[in-house]
Amino acid sequence: MSETRFHGARVRESTGLATAINDVDSSVIGIVATADDADETLFPLNKPTLLTRVSDVLGKAGTKGTLYKSLKAVADQVSTKVIVVRVPDASSQGAPDTGVTSFGHLDPEDRAFFGIDESEDAHPVYPHKTQDQYVIGGTDGDGNYTGMYALLIAEQDDAIGYRPRIIAAPGLDTEAVTKSLCVIAEKLRAFVYAGCHNCKKPADAISYRARFNERELMLVWPDFIAHNPKSGANEVFPAAAYACGLRARIDHEQGWHKSLSNVPVRNVLGISSPVFWSLQSEDSDANNLNNKEITTIICRNGFRFWGNRTPETKAYIFEVYTRTAQVLADSIAEAQFETIDAPLTPANVKDVLSAIRAKLDALVTSGRLVGAECWYDVVDNSTTELRQGRVRIRYKYTPVPPLEDMELYQT
């Protein structure tokens, strides 16, 4: 039989390429807010809603509660994806809730005795809940997630498909809410920005900060003054909302390795409480707040957040240390999805090692890491472990610290 010949060049595409590791989207914001007069179709209660152009929906965010100001603050800083969970306003009698109290079993005289308004425009009566209960949420009687816990299911929602990485409840962030947000942040590998609730002076904020030690948190104080187009007045806007928007903008423009500090905040007029700051003075309000891991606000060529730290004082002391760990862990782990359940062969393990090393090298080259390495240790991978389908790969890295303290020696 004659042999078939070919005179030329052929290309055979291989599907066995090393996995490319891309950064997770670190700029997705998650906000919990109130707004009884918001568009109920766009902002249903206790359900995550994805906004891709925040500025386009400000007219549907209402004027009551915290939703409009939170979205306006974000939109003034950046155009990014925002996931909103609207919760009932505890101060409103008509705040909807899943646990409606029914009085249908009472006769008219009893209903009158209890002061139940049966007029057509009367609001239904609901079990009493505090605002913290609404914001924190949990699960209802049907197993549905409510309040901030609804952020946990955003990524698995077909209409959303994104995980919030920057989360806050601006204007609603009491101590209980902030601590609960940190629990959610740990589950999502997200970062929380929160105000110092009810603190009027630097000393109040410093005392408040002593109650926290979470690495997923940055406390900010005071708040901003900004113009509210809906009321026509200059009003207090939560600084945490601006922190979320600015954080997303920095991620877009510079990267998650750059801290929130010393970047101009757009479209603000002032701050809610005075803060003394001097670049060269250790004895200032700003430095005292920073020394207690509170990010404050200064005015120099515009208003700027001033501070880099989390309440965690051991390993993850800087905001960027926590966020670097989060982004790196998720980027590397999520890229292995297609590898899971593939044959555990030396070739596949080498491909994983190659992909991780390439990613780490790229991050070092781009200045997002100081250094990094990845390796396979035979001590971790005994024959017994490998036969059980388990492989262990190690990597380590050095995050990029912010240049926080510069000493200049003049002679």
Q: Each PLM stretch: what is its role?
A:
Residues 180-182, 374-375, 407-411:
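Composition- and surface-driven signal marking solvent-exposed, interaction-prone regions
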Residues 93-94, 176, 402-405:
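Intrinsically disordered, low-complexity acidic/polar segments
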Residues 380-411:
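C-terminal edge-of-domain segments
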